[in-house]
């Protein structure tokens, strides 16, 4: 079979044998692709750090029976350096990568919109100019929109009556009117659904002006909505929710953990 090229984000990797790795890629034109990078764990590997998670690359692959084979890699954007340097950025980035893999669908199904959204989100996280919690929630909302799971925010999820509506019910699909409101609905504080709409629409001026209390409520609703559709919790989200306010590097975090181990031992 013929070689093919594509733009890709490296989502994750794991060891294969003594020198190889299997990489999971979110490509623009071929969706999720799992491929073998031969010899990448050797110090003289021609691929080096270009196949680390968070990398945005131009990749050439040879189709295989079960796994494709990476034959060439060119770096497009080196997001990893800035993301890994800060623990908050790192956990936010990990949540983005995990979400992208879960929402990409079947392997080799083209995912240009999700690929474009993921690249933009990683670029914003690496840049560090916007609050990480807002960046992540905006990404989750828009990624769910691409997958067809976005919550109803401006109309009733059941009858489509235009809002705003105060009640919110995850299993029904988002905001619900007083007539359709099912048992178990929540009533988020004023401004919470408006903030979700601002994040979905990319209205960053309104989003960044929202109080911390509204941002916390939004994070909870967005995470719950996503996990209801996925039918399980993302492994990385609890870490982001706990540590996103701390501007501590990965090295500092590891040093603190080592210090705790020493003190406890």
Swiss-Prot record:
One Gene Ontology term from the biological process aspect of the record: DNA recombination
Pfam family, any one: RecO_N
Gene Ontology terms: cellular component: bacterial nucleoid; peptidoglycan-based cell wall
Keyword annotations: DNA damage, DNA recombination, DNA repair
Top-level taxon: Bacteria
Known function: Involved in DNA repair and RecF pathway recombination.
Recorded family membership: Belongs to the RecO family.
PANTHER family: DNA REPAIR PROTEIN RECO (PTHR33991:SF1)
Name the record gives this protein: DNA repair protein RecO
Organism name: Mycobacterium tuberculosis (strain ATCC 25618 / H37Rv)
Gene that produces this protein: recO
